Amino acid sequence: MLEKFSSKFNVLKHSTTNGLLSVQINPNDIYEAVLFVRDNIGFEILADIVCVDNLYIDKEKRFSLYYIFRKISSENLCIYIDIDINQSVKSVESIYKSANWGERECFDQFGVKFENHPNLKRILNHKDFQGYPLRKDYPITKYQVLYESDDLVGEMKNEMQRAGLASEENDEFKTKYTFLNIGPSHPATHGTIRNFVALDGEKIISCVTEIGYLHRGFEKACENHSYAQIIPYTDRLNYCSAMLNNVGYAKAVEEALGLNLPDRGIFMRVILGELARIIDHEVCLGAMFVDMGGLTNYWYLYNPRERIYNFLSKLTGARFTNSFARIGGMANDFYDGWKEELLAHLKDVEKGVDDTMILIEKNRIFLDRVQNICKINANDALSYGFSGPNLRASGVSFDLRKDKPYYYYDSFDFSVPVGSEGDIYDRMFVRFFEMRESISIIRQAIKLIPEGKISVDDKDVFLPSKDQVYSNIESLINHFKLIFDGIKLPNGHFYSASEGANGELGFFIFSNSEPNPYRVKLRPPCFYALNAFSSMVQGSLIADSILNLGSLNIIAGELDR
């Protein structure tokens, strides 16, 4: 791949870390390089765009932009460029639709400008925000209050002009159509998301999405905390499957350190991660049934979920935000009798799934609401950066557990459910079938889980036990040293991805070998799924858009960070 790329472009630097080939090129070549990567090398997905402020790094240019690409055959590629503080970059939105919001985020947080971008405006921070918060010289304690919200009329006019529904010369569209805000504080949005729609009757003609209402500055906080201190923050990303966030982040740090976990710790992560996936899907589907008036279905899914929460509470001490993973292992081992309890809970989940599917499979009212509604085809889904159940619903069989296996997933017997139409029906039923597969994986893992340690025996990574600290001076010193000095990664950038409940959960880490990460960038699957929402709902009814939003399973904590 490097040889093919080098034959076309001047490669300034290249390196390979943990299987990720990274290539530095001239900034002027970025558009042609991205086009070449898609059309000649075959990378279907632009997974993320990451900006790093080099203010305290020994680099000549102020910013570096990293473009992370993925093939559904599991290969990754990173192309990066260095640019000056006032240097603009060609937009690649016309090549990959996922670049639209990815570039907007770089502009919002760092001030990087992209030429020919169709809507270069802030996305996570509000319209009156001054400065660029992820620049190194922006103080973390500085906050800015928004006193008047954006009416979004100007953005709506631009969207309608591009669609030929409005004219630049006049504002006739304001009287021709009805305008409605769906959110940001509405029970049907399942989170703080605002969709401003233009209506012809009940049909949506155009839609503008505004996010950022739950933006807490997760990535800025990461730069000001040690690697271990970040774990509780990950719980608050996709809070419906907190354990998967813990595991995804810990996995990224461990891969950068070259750590190999004990088998029992790995199996614990598989079991608890699949439980989190089940909970997440139950929340998604149960909430959708409430939206369409199916309360019986809701309780069939929510009651077993409650029992799993009780299990997690007993194990971790917390129902919702568990903070149970550790860099190098797990916080504690399973308690006595956990297998019997968990197997009983899995039977409850299985029965709830079966009973729900019996109620809806031939229900004409249900089928009319979800079949052939808000469809997205495979090519568009890939271009928008879809992953997980939403991508598989469009007919693309891609699952990181299968295609780039980790944690012994290649030794488990499970299938990857795939849809065909990319409609609401497929997005729902892919999740139903995935719950069955997760149950199967957990049962297999319960049979196979070995005895032994749950964490690495490495004083530079994992804290000694309390018994050791209280009885051994060397352990006390190791504890003291790790707390004060922290975990230190090698210099460089690292990207790690795991299969979250909503798709590819990626963590990009830039390290300068200090106790705190120099830069952490989260790749939230929700972010790129919602980017496509506006195009998906055009021509549909208001009621359809509510179900479509639910079927994408947008979690505001992960979306806004």
Curated annotation (Swiss-Prot):
EC class: translocase
UniProt region (NADH dehydrogenase I subunit D), positions on chain: 176-561
Listed Pfam families: Complex1_30kDa, Complex1_49kDa
EC number: 7.1.1.-
Region (NADH dehydrogenase I subunit C): 1-152
Subcellular location per the Swiss-Prot or TrEMBL entry: Cell inner membrane
Catalytic activities: a quinone + NADH + 5 H(+)(in) = a quinol + NAD(+) + 4 H(+)(out)
Gene Ontology CC terms: NADH dehydrogenase complex; plasma membrane
Protein family membership: In the N-terminal section; belongs to the complex I 30 kDa subunit family.
HAMAP family, alphabetized: NDH1_NuoCD_2, NDH1_NuoD
Assembly mode: NDH-1 is composed of 13 different subunits. Subunits NuoB, CD, E, F, and G constitute the peripheral sector of the complex.
Entry function: NDH-1 shuttles electrons from NADH, via FMN and iron-sulfur (Fe-S) centers, to quinones in the respiratory chain. The immediate electron acceptor for the enzyme in this species is believed to be ubiquinone. Couples the redox reaction to proton translocation (for every two electrons transferred, four hydrogen ions are translocated across the cytoplasmic membrane), and thus conserves the redox energy in a proton gradient.
Protein name listed in UniProt: NADH-quinone oxidoreductase subunit C/D
Species of origin: Campylobacter fetus subsp. fetus (strain 82-40)
Highest classification ranks of the organism: Bacteria, Pseudomonadati, Campylobacterota, Epsilonproteobacteria, Campylobacterales
